Amino acid sequence: GQGTGGGGAGGYRNSFSSETSGGGGSSESAVSGAVGDYTVTAGAGGANPGVGYNRSNDGSNSVFGQITSVGGGAGGTETINAGVGYDGGSGGGHMGNKNQSGDGTANQGFRGGENTSGGGGTGGGGAGAAGADSPASSNVGTAGGAGLASSITGASVTRAGGGGGGTNSSGTAGAAG
């Protein structure tokens, strides 16, 4: 059967002084804006490609004025481009034995997991950690990278975790980050 790597989380940027941005980045400078109109776009996650041997889709960018968080990278599909993961805010995991996950964007997210065995798919990267690598000869999908907790809204909420890796036969899929 066919499997895929997990999708990467969308880019995570934070200006709350006691917290960090994704990918190990420091807190960003707060934005001070004048009264006026601003373009705000909430980027969607990558759409499911459906049944069959179709490439997964990247997430869309989120935009606030001049600030852009990059959409998450798609997970690799074993029959397309040797299963490589795609770059994004956080990188997609991969499927197959090419050992090439997608990269995250600096100060937004981490890479997807790595795999040389050709077994289960690796997890997508998260804001707080890379997707989990796959051990040799494993047919189990690995976990997505952890997100980051933020208390900017009052209560602590974890955001931007990576998607778990899929499996190519009777193995078990990985958990989300």
What do these predicted regions represent?
Residues 1-177:
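Low-complexity, glycine/proline-biased repetitive segments and flexible coils/loops
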